[in-house]
Amino acid sequence: MAKDNSEKLQVQGEEKKSKQPVNFLPQGKWLKPNEIEYEFGGTTGVIGMLIGFPLLMYYMWICAEFYHGKVALPKAGESWMHFIKHLYQLVLENGIPEKYDWTIFLTFWVFQIIFYYTLPGIWTKGQPLSHLKGKQLPYFCNAMWTLYVTTTLVLVLHFTNLFRLYVIIDRFGRIMTCAIISGFAFSIILYLWTLFISHDYHRMTGNHLYDFFMGAPLNPRWGILDLKMFFEVRLPWFTLYFITLGACLKQWETYGYVTPQLGVVMLAHWLYANACAKGEELIVPTWDMAYEKFGFMLIFWNIAGVPYTYCHCTLYLYYHDPSEYHWSTLYNVSLYVVLLCAYYFFDTANAQKNAFRKQMSGDKTGRKTFPFLPYQILKNPKYMVTSNGSYLLIDGWYTLARKIHYTADWTQSLVWALSCGFNSVFPWFFPVFFLVVLIHRAFRDQAKCKRKYGKDWDEYCKHCPYVFIPYVF
């Protein structure tokens, strides 16, 4: 450990970072009994989510499309059993996929895979992996090209009437079922493949339900295609983006204009999809890629959960006449201003953190993708050198709050919901759910960093004392 604070404040490039990973967390194929720490309520919580996730998705969709965005409840004098049968009948009539729905769903997957293998991109390396004796896996990143080639192709198909994009909303229940089935099927196949064929499993508890949920493999691949990275960017956020783009095209076709409310949601979803695409190589060195296993939780949520629950602001604006959400000009302008300000902090904070990681690893390559915003890269950033050889950034936006990118991220989600007003609870699902997720992740990260850095983390917190909101939280 450095003797005093002045020795911990270093200028970039003064020291060489060790390429050997630090084993501060359990490693190996099987966890020892004293290493097992169940998250999400253990087996009971996992069973609840395996059943609850799809049921919640169906219920939210039914309320959005068939109950005018209201919470569906039994009518006066209607029994709960009759009510549940009615909901089930709606799923049978409107949520069972036909061949056309599977064609739409799988064609998108196929083209995303083809584009991954064929479009230009850049190569980068992940973190040193303990189970591979410090080896860094190569990652090919071309999501930026993929996003805009896919957008061009989709618009050509739409305007030539070969495929009207808003069909994915008109057949929402059926296509969502395709995603739910695929999420379960892919998770089961990958888990069994890992256990019995590849044997590339890690940190298993021996509780198959829990291990299935959390995942068995760490970095499953099809050649150069890393499944975890592929699922994290292209399937969820591109799908959400195209759902909203379809809604905009429908409004333009129906009314001759796109409402300011749907416009701000479209801007938000494009900004987010674009941010994930342009920063794909910056996802590579994150905790999720280096240590999070790839199981049902990540697979299902990326295939089905994210695109088909986070889109309820879009569904509300699509299913309702614009007269039902006619806000004042000041309110509408405020939504755009708050969104763009939040995005600026979200983009630049993440860029500062990830550029610092690249600098410390000796990677001096730069990539200026649109939009390249001021203050994305810190020159000669201040940082701490910990006793285990790691570097902690104590400069830029992170001196204001350690999770300032979470705050900015959540603020964007708040704008999504505010665009719809308060007549339906379902557009508010994402910001409420996301707030819980971010708080859980923040405290999980706090505990992880405390274990990893020890007293160095206490020193770091003196430099960056706030978590979410400067001088408040």
From Swiss-Prot:
Residues 1-18 have a biased composition (Basic and acidic residues). It comes from the Eukaryota. The keyword Flavoprotein does not apply. It holds the Pfam family ERG4_ERG24. It is found in: Endoplasmic reticulum membrane. One of its GO terms (cellular component) is endoplasmic reticulum. Pathway: Steroid metabolism; ergosterol biosynthesis; ergosterol from zymosterol: step 5/5. It catalyses: ergosterol + NADP(+) = ergosta-5,7,22,24(28)-tetraen-3beta-ol + NADPH + H(+). Residues 65-101, 158-174, 250-326, 440-473 are cytoplasmic. The keyword Lipid biosynthesis applies. Its EC number is 1.3.1.71. NADP(+) binds at residues 353, 357, 393, 405-406, 445, 449-453, 460. GO terms for molecular function: Delta24(24-1) sterol reductase activity; Delta24-sterol reductase activity. GO terms for biological process: ergosterol biosynthetic process. Residues 1-39, 124-138, 198-232, 347-414 are lumenal. PANTHER family: DELTA(14)-STEROL REDUCTASE, DELTA(24(24(1)))-STEROL REDUCTASE ERG4. This is Delta(24(24(1)))-sterol reductase ERG4. It comes from Saccharomyces cerevisiae (strain ATCC 204508 / S288c).
